[in-house]
């Protein structure tokens, strides 16, 4: 597989073309950002951890029948993926109150929600990725009502599967962000699943093992990412 020109660079990843128009290479960076890029920094080795964790979790989900863009791991920082037309609606699944949910509604942090909540956010850095509802997404032409319904159903399946997966490894899946895209007439799960996109707490101590350690200057950021990698991969 020949690596071509870079076709996109985001805050945490670069996307490269390949000699196959249906496939791209996703490369993970050590760059870190928070609060809509108002805070920036570097987490040493983050790209390696996020690539390895994402590869493992995408493979696990595929084995459960949840289709996604992952094809194969190419290197410690790179994965080969199906090229998606990204849907500009991010899905956040929430199981435990944390982050913006606490701030927005005055909930107690760590309050277990009676059922998982699915939220939609407009994928737009300039606007700060605002919260939106299904009607907004359809009215703005982001996706059809049927596509939004499918994306939410898939997100719920991913949530159920990952809650079990992480709990078996001593981690609570507090909340996480998912992105989806279109590929050859199908909607597939894309992007990444990692400590960058998931809030993960130790099931016993409730220690935060994710990007919140960077966001709020909690220290031991690299160690937290390595711990998640160790638990996910088992080595």
From Swiss-Prot:
<dbReference type="InterPro" id="IPR028923">
    <property type="entry name" value="SAICAR_synt/ADE2_N"/>
</dbReference>
<dbReference type="GO" id="GO:0009236">
    <property type="term" value="P:cobalamin biosynthetic process"/>
</dbReference>
<comment type="pathway">
    <text>Purine metabolism; IMP biosynthesis via de novo pathway; 5-amino-1-(5-phospho-D-ribosyl)imidazole-4-carboxamide from 5-amino-1-(5-phospho-D-ribosyl)imidazole-4-carboxylate: step 1/2.</text>
</comment>
<keyword id="KW-0658">Purine biosynthesis</keyword>
<keyword id="KW-0067">ATP-binding</keyword>
<comment type="similarity">
    <text>Belongs to the SAICAR synthetase family.</text>
</comment>
<dbReference type="GO" id="GO:0005524">
    <property type="term" value="F:ATP binding"/>
</dbReference>
<dbReference type="InterPro" id="IPR018236">
    <property type="entry name" value="SAICAR_synthetase_CS"/>
</dbReference>
<dbReference type="InterPro" id="IPR050089">
    <property type="entry name" value="SAICAR_synthetase"/>
</dbReference>
<dbReference type="GO" id="GO:0004639">
    <property type="term" value="F:phosphoribosylaminoimidazolesuccinocarboxamide synthase activity"/>
</dbReference>
<keyword id="KW-0547">Nucleotide-binding</keyword>
<protein>
    <recommendedName>
        <fullName>Phosphoribosylaminoimidazole-succinocarboxamide synthase</fullName>
        <ecNumber>6.3.2.6</ecNumber>
    </recommendedName>
</protein>
<dbReference type="InterPro" id="IPR001636">
    <property type="entry name" value="SAICAR_synth"/>
</dbReference>
<dbReference type="Pfam" id="PF01259">
    <property type="entry name" value="SAICAR_synt"/>
</dbReference>
<dbReference type="GO" id="GO:0006189">
    <property type="term" value="P:'de novo' IMP biosynthetic process"/>
</dbReference>
<dbReference type="InterPro" id="IPR033934">
    <property type="entry name" value="SAICAR_synt_PurC"/>
</dbReference>
<keyword id="KW-0436">Ligase</keyword>
